[in-house]
Amino acid sequence: MRSKFKDEHPFEKRKAEAERIRQKYPDRIPVICEKADRTDIPTIDKKKYLVPSDLTVGQFVYVIRKRIKLAPEKAIFIFVDEVLPPTAALMSAIYEEHKDEDNFLYVSYSGENTFGQEGWVELPVDDMDKAFICVSAAKKHWVWVLCDVRSSYQNCVLIVPLVQRPVLHTHSSFLSVSFALLFV
């Protein structure tokens, strides 16, 4: 996603501002937060944030939710370099890994998972035709995963209500399953 902040401010000015902020507030992270294109989520009233370095991504999402006055039942997704960061990660770690060459961290938010999320996960399942796996997601929300083991484990769907790297619970043997995260 192209940053409007970058378009509106020359590189030298952005870099000087970020360096000044880091010198004055060494325990704060300079963050630019902008709404992603083509989303119906409200626009945030301010783009620049000085975030405590010990704040988690999940806590930052909470701040953004409050700033845009998003209803609790509505989903919000934040992206850093078009990737969903783990909600338990510290903003300082995300900053060190993803800061721009101007020393700002650029975060976009959306009401949809616009970039998708795919990957591999070890799912523990019993040896049966169909297995239900209980998953604990952010804030202890419980969801279920249905795997049709007769079709080479290709029909596994994980549905979680919030952005979160899932923690899987159950017993038995492990198997690798390709999955796509679908957010509701």
Curated annotation (Swiss-Prot):
DNA damage found in the keyword field: no
GO BP, sorted A to Z: autophagy; protein transport
Positions where lipid (Phosphatidylethanolamine amidated glycine) attaches: G116
Keywords: Autophagy, Cytoplasmic vesicle, Lipoprotein, Membrane, Protein transport, Transport, Ubl conjugation pathway, Vacuole
Source organism, top-level taxon: Eukaryota
InterPro entries: Atg8-like, Ubiquitin-like_domsf
Positions of the propeptide removed during maturation: 117-184
Site positions for Cleavage: G116, Q117
Any Pfam family the entry gives: ATG8
Description of post-translational modifications: The C-terminal 68 residues are removed to expose Gly-116 at the C-terminus. The C-terminal Gly is then amidated with phosphatidylethanolamine by an activating system similar to that for ubiquitin.
Primary location group: membrane
Cellular component annotations (GO), alphabetically ordered: autophagosome membrane; cytoplasmic vesicle
Subcellular location, record wording: Cytoplasmic vesicle, Autophagosome membrane; Vacuole membrane
Topology of the protein relative to the lipid bilayer: Lipid-anchor
Sequence similarity: Belongs to the ATG8 family.
Described purpose of this protein according to its UniProt entry: Ubiquitin-like modifier involved in autophagosome formation. With ATG4, mediates the delivery of the autophagosomes to the vacuole via the microtubule cytoskeleton. Required for selective autophagic degradation of the nucleus (nucleophagy) as well as for mitophagy which contributes to regulate mitochondrial quantity and quality by eliminating the mitochondria to a basal level to fulfill cellular energy requirements and preventing excess ROS production. Participates also in membrane fusion events that take place in the early secretory pathway.
Name under which the protein is recorded: Autophagy-related protein 8
Organism: Laccaria bicolor
